[in-house]
Every structure is written in structure tokens, then in C-alpha cells.
């Protein structure tokens, strides 16, 4: 499922559902966003309701909304304590951990309990950061990757990574990227043959303007190694995880948002790209993407 972001000349409010396994299966769109949202965050509540928070302009960049199913049911929520766009998030046991953001950039984060709508815990980040990635690598370990920020009032593109452990509830420095980057996409999946965990960082920009990157970096457990390049430089795309691959969607190629989708797979530590038959209906950048169960939408096989 993808929603929000920026299309060719306007904000995108449509919510598309794409079957990642079969290009012949076409799914009915879900309800449109109530608010315009570029650079928002989101997750799936109880495997049923897609929650979207923050983003620009989105009124005050704090409000959230739940996208209903195909019956157009929608709910408005107000959960975030701070204005956030270009933040990054992970979903942990019905809690949305939202980190950083360009409003600052921010050194704060918040863990929102969806059940009661309250902030359960606030975790200070190791630096002021936005346009970064946050991914869950194991049940205990999370990895914050790249972005723009640094110290207070700094706007440096970062090559740093930081581990966060739930066990110690603290941060520790991870291995540096080969290339400092912001507005990149990140994904975690398993190697098809070895079953090893793959962490991949894709594209982005290495400047405060728009010097786009086509490079890909893959974490081998010790350091970052360059992987297969993108066919074109790309920033502001999104990736979702399948068990043995990562799917790259949309993004900005330096001229326009794109609708192209590509799949990254690794075998025996060697990774490769495959262009998918599926495409986004609406080209977009800086959107929200997530995996949803089949029960949330109505799909038909058109083969």
C-alpha cells in the first residue's frame, strides 16, 4: 500500500494497493488521505488500519489519520507531540516509534502507544537528524542510517549509522557508510540462499541540494559494501520488505517523480535488481509505503 507524497505537480492524496507477487492482480484503491502529506510516517494498527502521521504541509505536521478500508471509512487522530516531516519510523508491538525529522532537524523521538493515543516513551537520538532511515534488524536491535543534521543547527549530510538496543535502551555507533546520503531508502530482508539478514541502503542525495545517487550499499554484518547500482540516480523513494527481497517504489529521478518498481534480491551475498511489471498508478516521491494483509482490499485477477 502506498499513500500521500508529491506527484508531478501536486500533492498526492490517493491510496494505492499493489500486489507484489502477481502483476495480473489489480486491487481497488483504499480511501484518499484527508490531509496533504509529503514526508509523512505510518504503520499498520492491529493488522487492520493504516495509520499516517505528520508530513508537510498536513496542517500542523502533528496530526494523524487512519485510512479506512474500501468502504471509505476514515478516522482522524492527533497523536504526535511534535511537528514532524522527513522523519523515520518503525512499528513495535502496536507502538509507532517516530524519530527525528526536518523540523529542526530534530534530536527527539517519540514512541506512541496506539491503544491509548499517548506517548509511552521518548528516546533522545544521538544527533539532530532528518531525511534518514530507521530499520529493525533483529527483535532487539534497530539501525539509524544517514540523513541530514549533526549538531545543533547543523545541516550536514551524514555517513554515520547508529545502533539502538531495546535491552540497554541506548545508542552505540555503527559502521560508517561509504557514501554520506540523505533521502535514501532502506530495507531489511533475508538472503535467498544463505538466509542471512541483508540490510540495504539505496540511492538518495549526498548534498543539501539535489546531487542524486545511484549507489547501493549492503551491510555484511561488519561493514558496508557497495551493491548493484540503480539504473538511474534516485532519491525520496520507498522500500518495503518481503521475506527474501526488498521492493523499491517511486522516487525522484532529478526531473520528475517516477512510478517504476524494482525488486532487490541477494543470493550467496551477491545482490541484483529486477525491474517489476507492476507500477504505481500515480508517480510519487516522499510517500508512505507499507505491507498490508489481503483482507483489507478487494483484488481481482485480470489475466
Where are these regions (language model features)?
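Kelch-like beta-propeller repeat domains
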Residues: 1-303
Amino acid at each position: 500500500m502506498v499513500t500521500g507524497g508529491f506527484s508531478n505537480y501536486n500533492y498526492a492524496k490517493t491510496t494505492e494497493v499493489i500486489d507484489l507477487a502477481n502483476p495480473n492482480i489489480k486491487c481497488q484503491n483504499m480511501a484518499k488521505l484527508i490531509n496533504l502529506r509529503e514526508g509523512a510516517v505510518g504503520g499498520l494498527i492491529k493488522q487492520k488500519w493504516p495509520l499516517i502521521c505528520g508530513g508537510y504541509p498536513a496542517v500542523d505536521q502533528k496530526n494523524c489519520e487512519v485510512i479506512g478500508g474500501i468502504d471509505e471509512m476514515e478516522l482522524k487522530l492527533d497523536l504526535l507531540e511534535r511537528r514532524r516531516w522527513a522523519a523515520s519510523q518503525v512499528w513495535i508491538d502496536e507502538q509507532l516509534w517516530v524519530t527525528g525529522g526536518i523540523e529542526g532537524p530534530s534530536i527527539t523521538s517519540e514512541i506512541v502507544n496506539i491503544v491509548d493515543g499517548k506517548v509511552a516513551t521518548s528516546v533522545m537520538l544521538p544527533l539532530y537528524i532528518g531525511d534518514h532511515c530507521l530499520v529493525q534488524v533483529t527483535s532487539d536491535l534497530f539501525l539509524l542510517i544517514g540523513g541530514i543534521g549533526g549538531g545543533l543547527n547543523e545541516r550536514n549530510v551524514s555517513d554515520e549509522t547508529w545502533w539502538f538496543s531495546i535491552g540497554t535502551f541506548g545508542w552505540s555507533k555503527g559502521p560508517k557508510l561509504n557514501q554520506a546520503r540523505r533521502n535514501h531508502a532502506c530495507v531489511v530482508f533475508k538472503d535467498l540462499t544463505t538466509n542471512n539478514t541483508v540490510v540495504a541502503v539505496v540511492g538518495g542525495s549526498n548534498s543539501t541540494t539535489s546531487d542524486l545517487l545511484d549507489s547501493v550499499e549492503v551491510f555484511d554484518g561488519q561493514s558496508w559494501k557497495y551493491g548493484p547500482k540503480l539504473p538511474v540516480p534516485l532519491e525520496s523513494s520507498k522500500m518495503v520488505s518481503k521475506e527474501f527481497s526488498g521492493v523499491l517504489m517511486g522516487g525522484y529521478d532529478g526531473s520528475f517523480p517516477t512510478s517504476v518498481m524494482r525488486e532487490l534480491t541477494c543470493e550467496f551475498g551477491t545482490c541484483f535488481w529486477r525491474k517489476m511489471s507492476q507500477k504505481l498508478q500515480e508517480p510519487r516521491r516522499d510517500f508512505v509505503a507499507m505491507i498490508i494483509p489481503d483482507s483489507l482490499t478487494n483484488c481481482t485477477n485480470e489475466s
